[in-house]
Regions:
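A glycine-rich dinucleotide-binding beta-alpha-beta segment and adjacent secondary-structure elements
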Residues: 1-44
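N-terminal helix-loop segment corresponding to the beta1-alpha1 unit
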Residues: 20, 45, 49, 53-196
Length: 196
């Protein structure tokens, strides 16, 4: 029940809600998803009507709020050198689903490990979510921001671990890895004949 959310002791203690007024009505709205002490979130005012701020948002001269503690500089593009990371030389096979497993694999990869994600072509998982923008071409399988966020810096291979060939290739791959990362339901790996 949303009324319970508005009474949440945790959210109230964190001063999470903000007050908004729209069309003469004032109500509580969600605040920022996280708080940073040196660079707090700056909320824009609520619009009185749908589309009321469109011209303003599209105006290149709009003075977007920048906190005084932010130091701005031109970012230079550089190639990531994974061999410099603290986990360089570590090899990880990732057989994960949803969010927690892929984000753990991403942390390994971001820190320099060679992470190989096992994907199933019949279940593209988060690859199928939200194309940005709405068109699905070309290379629609590369267009999910959610998938890209969770799987950056990884390599991938499609293997169906339910088949003899897929399982055989997987077992060959894990001979050369240091870590097998998986977060499936407890029965899944065992049913695939890949239990510990």
């Amino acid at each position: 029940d949303m009324a319970d959310v508005l009474k949440s002791e945790q959210l109230l203690a964190r001063d999470w809600f903000r007050s908004l007024s729209v069309a003469g009505k004032t109500f509580s709205a969600p605040g920022a998803p996280y708080k940073l002490s040196r660079t707090p979130c700056t909320h824009l005012s609520a619009s009185e009507a749908v589309g009321a701020s469109t011209d303003l948002m599209l105006d290149d001269s709009f003075p977007w709020p920048i906190h005084e503690n932010i130091v701005t500089k031109k970012c230079e593009t550089q190639e990531t050198n994974k061999s410099n990371g603290p986990l360089a030389g570590l090899r990880v096979i990732e057989v994960t689903a949803n969010w927690a497993g892929p984000i753990a694999g991403r942390h390994f990869a971001d820190l320099g490990a060679d992470v190989i994600k096992i994907e199933l072509d019949t279940k593209p998982a988060t690859r199928a979510l939200a194309y940005v923008p709405a068109d699905i071409w070309p290379d629609h399988y590369h267009r999910s921001g959610y998938f890209n966020k969770l799987n950056r810096n990884k390599r991938a291979i499609c293997l169906n671990l339910a088949t003899t060939k897929g399982r055989s290739l997987f077992l060959k791959l894990i001979e050369s890895v240091d870590v097998v990362l998986e977060n499936n339901a407890a029965r899944v790996m065992k049913q695939l004949g890949l239990s510990y």
